[in-house]
């Protein structure tokens, strides 16, 4: 993947300003509320039987933060994202049996949450760079499935 200077700077800027403890939980809770079939991966997280329960579930919130911190690895290794996520791809494919399309659903929800936080600063150019980054990460996470 070729990255322009603007794309690199944009991705690094977004993640350097991101409040992981807010954006991560908001992203994962949005994902499991909008796409309820994704809840099957989180059954061990306790009460997730309603929107209110999901919004108040500390394990969902914690895992959302963990997911977001996992994206840091991609930000720090933008020139080698595929290898950066090879182990996680294998884990999600072989052990957790996560449908790889769910990575895209999560990235779509992350885009919505980030856009809401950034407001007018989330221009078309910024969104294009952000979604390009997420697309490369999603493809890398799904790599083990092929």
From Swiss-Prot:
Example of a GO biological process term: hydrogen peroxide catabolic process
Source organism of this protein record: Chelidonichthys kumu
Record domain Globin: where: 2-146
Function: Involved in oxygen transport from gills to the various peripheral tissues.
Record keywords: Disulfide bond, Heme, Iron, Metal-binding, Oxygen transport, Transport
GO cellular component: blood microparticle; haptoglobin-hemoglobin complex; hemoglobin complex
Residue ranges the record marks as coiled coil: none
Known partners and oligomeric status: Heterotetramer of two alpha chains and two beta chains. Can form polymers.
Entries under PANTHER family matching the protein: HEMOGLOBIN FAMILY MEMBER, HEMOGLOBIN SUBUNIT EPSILON
Name of the protein in its database record: Hemoglobin subunit beta
Entries under Pfam families matching the protein: Globin
Additional free-text comment from the UniProt record: Displays a strong alkaline Bohr effect, and at low pH exhibits the reduced ligand affinity and cooperativity that comprise the Root effect.
Gene Ontology molecular functions: haptoglobin binding; heme binding; metal ion binding; organic acid binding; oxygen binding; oxygen carrier activity; peroxidase activity
Family under the similarity heading: Belongs to the globin family.
Expression by tissue: Red blood cells.
């Amino acid at each position: 993947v070729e990255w322009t200077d603007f794309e690199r700077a944009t991705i690094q800027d977004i993640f350097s300003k991101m409040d992981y403890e807010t954006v991560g939980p908001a992203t994962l809770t949005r994902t499991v509320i909008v796409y309820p079939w994704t809840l099957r991966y989180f059954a061990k997280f306790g009460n997730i039987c309603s929107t209110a329960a999901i919004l108040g579930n500390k394990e969902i919130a914690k895992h959302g933060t963990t997911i977001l911190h996992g994206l840091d690895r991609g930000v720090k290794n933008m020139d080698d994202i595929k290898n950066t996520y090879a182990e996680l791809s294998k884990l999600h494919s072989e052990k957790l049996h996560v449908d790889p399309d769910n990575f895209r659903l999560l990235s779509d929800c992350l885009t919505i949450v980030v856009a809401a936080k950034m407001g007018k600063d989330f221009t078309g150019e910024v969104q294009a760079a952000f979604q390009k980054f997420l697309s490369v990460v999603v493809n890398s996470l799904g790599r083990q499935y092929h």
